[in-house]
Every structure is written in C-alpha cells, then in structure tokens.
Amino acid sequence: MSHVALQGLRGAGDHRLVSVSSAAVGAPGSPRRYLHSLWLLSARDLRVRYATSALGYLWSVLDPLVMSLIYWFVFTQVFHRGAGEEPYILFLITALLPWVWFNAAVSDFTRAFNKDARLVRSTAIPRSIWVNRIVLSKGIEFLFSLPVLVAFAILAGGTVSWGLLLFPVAVLLQTMFLVGLGLIVAPLCVIWGDLERTTRLILRALFYATPIIYGVSDLPAPFDAISAFNPLAGIFTLYRVGFFPAQWDTLSVVVGAVVSVVVLFLGVWTFKRLERSVLKEL
C-alpha cells in the first residue's frame, strides 16, 4: 500500500496519494492519514536526495564536518582565538550540526510550494504537510549526523554533564521553531518571489549573529544581551550545555523556548490566512 502511494508521489499531478484506502491509513483529514502522508513525502525527499549520490548518507555528515574543520583550523592554527571553549572542534560541532538543519530547512521553505505546485493544488491532504515534510526530512538528516558528534566527543576527550538530558528539549524547540517559521516563510515566498533571495541573505548574516563559532558569554556588552534575544542562541545553548556547562545562559534559553512557541502559533495563524492566496498564485 505504501508502495502505491509512493509511486503516486513520483509523478507530478498524480492523484494516487489520496487514493490510499482509509482502512490502511485512516479517514481523510485524520491525524493518522496526515502522519502517513508526511512520512511518505519525507521518505521520498531522502530517497531522491541520496539516490544519485555515491556517498549517500555521508553527505549529511560531510557538510558540518568540513565546516567545523575549516573554522577549527582558522581560529586555532592561523589566528589566535579568544572565544569558545576547549576542545574547540567539539564546541563548533555542537552548534554547527543544528545550524545545518536550520539553514537547510529554511532554504527549502522558500521553494516548498513552487517545487511541487501541481501536487499542492491537486492533493486532498492539508497543505501544511509541504512545510512539515521539510522539517522532518532535514531533522532525520540531523539525527543521522549525530554519530559525528559522538565520535568527536570521544576523540577530543570531551566530558559529559547533566546538560546532555536537555538535548531532546533542544530538538523539540528547534522543531517547533522551524515548523512555525516554515508556515510563515513558505507562503510568503509564493506571494513575493523576491523573498527567496532575501532569505538567503538573512541566513548568511544570521550565521554570524548566532553563537556558533563563539558563545553568548564571549560577547561584550551590549551585544551579549542583544544576542540572547536570538531564539537560536537559547536553542544552541541547550545543545552545548551537555558538554560545556559554563555555556548555560538562563535568559537566552527562556527567550528561545518562548519564541519557539510563539512562532509556532504565529505560523499556524499566518498560514490559515494565506493559504487561499497561495493556491491562487500557484
């Protein structure tokens, strides 16, 4: 049954996605039906991404790994580094891995509806699924890359603290933040085409405005307080605190949690009001 649905996804405009029997995946509009379709779409994204690649899964690891090695070399071997903690390579990876997830997801949000316009118009499943499939597929790639974090934690002699228990909380908050952000960005990019290029520029600036190659505590006043209101600062703090307890910053964590929830609800509200406009533009 899943094979039939997946075949339907491979052909643009094919309606077989919605022909899966209710007995197998639930009645139309049911959570079970939604989750089943979400999984099929996410699995398709992963399959397409790696089907023509000789390295396959390794690509989800190479990007953050190469970035980490470059920054480690520049800031430890070329220039004197005054920020971050030791082992610095582990310090980098704990933030770069979730950043790659965030960056890849937001980049794909800008094409979420235009890429599969015919399916978006013709299928009966809720259209928010075209955003959530990106969050899920990129999130799975993030989870696949975690062995790199474990390997460097062992090789670099990193120590584990109680904060590691907050790692799942960070994943949950980032998922909520991305879903809300996607429900805002995706429809707006259909209505205003220039927003796709604008988003790329914002992401480039956001990388350096987010505590990745440095920590929140490394910033001088008043930039430390300003940075705390970047929701990614609090989320990335939760990822790091399991290996670097001194990186804990209550203000940034609270702000990250609150903003993630607010953006999620704002995204749902925005999407409901823009959905008709999106369908007219597609």
Show which residues each predicted segment covers.
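Hydrophobic transmembrane alpha-helices and immediately adjacent juxtamembrane helices
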Residues: 1-282
